[in-house]
Amino acid sequence: MTAVLPLPQPLADPAPRDPRQRLQREQLRLGKRLQRQVGQAIADFGMIAPGDKIMVCLSGGKDSYTLLDMLLQLQRKAPVPFSLVAVNLDQKQPDFPAHVLPAYLRGLGVPFAIVEQDTYSVVSRVIPAGKTMCSLCSRLRRGALYAYAQTHGVTKIALGHHRDDIVATFFMNLFHHARLAAMAPKLRSDDGAHVVIRPLAYVREADIAAYAQARQFPIIPCNLCGSQENLQRQQVGKLLQQWDRESPGRVEQIARALGDVRPEQLADRTLFDFLALGRSGDAPSGLDPDPRAWLSAGHATHDSD
């Protein structure tokens, strides 16, 4: 008689993964992605040189906290030595928790300075109630930070602008100023004395927000300009968020396009010599009519018109 073997029992479902462990792994992957993107931006634009003293402008927002955190992590394994100093500008805003940043930075063991300058009173006095304060506030803030950098041997000034800031600035310039311009990942400061770098240039704002939440940074809200509604940047930001929801990857494509400019396919005569295009190499340039003659011809009228 042939033995009847018992049917194999179905394998039990694996035990559900611990949600805390899964969250930790996701946060670890996020941190590594941000480090990789920051390192790539630094390499692509030559942001950091050996011996640089980098001033990290720390506002107390998620972006600047993430910037400092990334640079501290990269500093430990960077191919070149550089130093960091975190600098916060105390603008004397009402109810500003002045103790938060010093306590946080002391806990990290990071060299830091608090620059006190009452820009709040200046802005409040000059700007009418209900008007946007961001532009004037930004200029005053830059002046104070540049002055500190000048007197303390700073060679690079690191700002926390991210990919979405850069794309938003592009559209603000396009919509409101009729020019194609954004934020450069690296540029000369307004006073001409320093180089400004934006190591978060490749990082999405959503990733920064998630990272800041995971790291539990002590976020300080901006009560001066960040809470004002209907600002141009907020409007553009909402547009970008809508695009990300409806067409994932569109904002990333726009960001990449900022690094692939084709002057010959635009209309800026200072970037491309349209007058020389199509001109015979043997034809003397003196035979070309004065461009102003075409303008005069365009204005000419006849009795039959």
Curated annotation (Swiss-Prot):
Residues annotated to bind [4Fe-4S] cluster: C134, C137, C225
Q: Chief localization class?
A: cytoplasm
Function, in words: Catalyzes the ATP-dependent 2-thiolation of cytidine in position 32 of tRNA, to form 2-thiocytidine (s(2)C32). The sulfur atoms are provided by the cysteine/cysteine desulfurase (IscS) system.
Known partners and oligomeric status: Homodimer.
Gene Ontology biological-process entries: tRNA thio-modification
Among its keywords, does the record have 4Fe-4S? yes
Q: Which PANTHER family match?
A: AMINOTRAN_5 DOMAIN-CONTAINING PROTEIN, SULFURTRANSFERASE-RELATED
Under Gene Ontology molecular function, one entry of this record is: 4 iron, 4 sulfur cluster binding
Q: What is this protein called?
A: tRNA-cytidine(32) 2-sulfurtransferase
Residue ranges, annotated region (Disordered): 1-20, 282-305
The record, for SUPFAM superfamilies, names: Adenine nucleotide alpha hydrolases-like (SSF52402)
What EC number(s) is this enzyme filed under? Answer: 2.8.1.-
Give the miscellaneous note. The thiolation reaction likely consists of two steps: a first activation step by ATP to form an adenylated intermediate of the target base of tRNA, and a second nucleophilic substitution step of the sulfur (S) atom supplied by the hydrosulfide attached to the Fe-S cluster.
